[in-house]
C-alpha cells in the first residue's frame, strides 16, 4: 500500500470543435509520440467522413459507438489455494470508457483499409451499428465473465 495520500484525477479539457471531454480522451489515446495535432486532424477528418457515411450527426454516432463498446463485466485472475480462477467483476464507469476507447483505437488501427482516417471511420460506424472488432472484443469479455460465473463468490 502506498504511504502517500490519494492522487487527484486530472481534469480533462473539452476539445475545441465538439466541446466534449470524451473526444479529448479519444484523441489523446490515439496520439503517438506527442503528436496531438496529427491525431486531432485524423479524428476530425474521420468525423467528417462518419457524418457523410452514417447519415446522422457525427458526435451522436461517435458517442453511440463508444457506448456500445463499453463492457459491463470483465474477469480478473485470483489465486486461491494454489489454483488460479478467472473471477468476473463489474467494471467501474471510468474504466468502461477507457476500455471502449482503447479497443476502438486499437481495432481501428488493425483494420485493412488504407489510411487511418478510413480505418477509424469504418470502425466507429461498425461499432455504432453493433458490429466490428471492438464490439466482438466486448462480447468476448462478457462471454468469459459469463463462463466463469461460478467463481463470482471469490470476488474481493
Swiss-Prot record:
A Pfam family assignment: Ribosomal_S7
Family matches, as CDD domains: uS7_Bacteria
Name this protein carries in UniProt: Small ribosomal subunit protein uS7
Gene Ontology BP terms: translation
Gene: rpsG
Listed PANTHER family: RIBOSOMAL PROTEIN S7 (PTHR11205)
GO MF assignments: rRNA binding; structural constituent of ribosome; tRNA binding
Gene3D superfamilies according to UniProt: Ribosomal protein S7 domain
HAMAP family in the record: Ribosomal_uS7_B (MF_00480_B)
Family: Belongs to the universal ribosomal protein uS7 family.
Quaternary structure, from the entry: Part of the 30S ribosomal subunit. Contacts proteins S9 and S11.
Keyword tags: Ribonucleoprotein, Ribosomal protein, RNA-binding, rRNA-binding, tRNA-binding
UniProt-listed InterPro entries: Ribosomal_uS7, Ribosomal_uS7_bac/org-type, Ribosomal_uS7_CS, Ribosomal_uS7_dom, Ribosomal_uS7_dom_sf
A cellular component annotation (GO) from this entry: small ribosomal subunit
Amino acid at each position: 500500500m502506498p504511504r502517500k495520500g490519494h492522487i487527484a484525477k486530472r481534469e480533462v479539457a473539452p476539445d475545441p470543435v465538439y466541446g466534449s471531454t470524451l473526444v479529448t480522451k479519444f484523441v489523446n489515446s490515439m496520439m503517438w509520440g506527442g503528436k496531438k495535432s496529427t491525431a486531432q486532424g485524423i479524428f476530425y477528418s474521420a468525423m467528417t467522413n462518419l457524418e457523410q457515411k452514417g447519415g446522422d450527426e457525427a458526435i451522436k454516432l461517435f458517442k453511440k459507438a463508444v457506448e456500445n463498446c463499453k463492457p459491463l463485466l470483465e474477469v480478473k485472475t485470483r489465486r486461491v489455494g494454489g489454483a488460479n480462477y478467472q473471477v468476473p467483476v463489474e467494471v467501474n464507469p471510468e474504466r468502461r470508457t477507457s476500455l471502449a476507447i482503447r479497443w476502438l483505437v486499437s481495432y481501428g488501427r488493425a483494420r485493412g483499409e488504407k489510411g487511418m482516417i478510413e480505418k477509424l471511420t469504418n470502425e466507429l460506424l461498425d461499432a455504432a451499428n453493433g458490429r466490428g472488432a471492438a464490439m466482438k472484443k466486448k462480447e468476448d469479455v462478457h462471454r468469459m465473465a459469463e463462463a466463469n460465473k461460478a467463481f463470482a463468490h471469490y470476488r474481493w
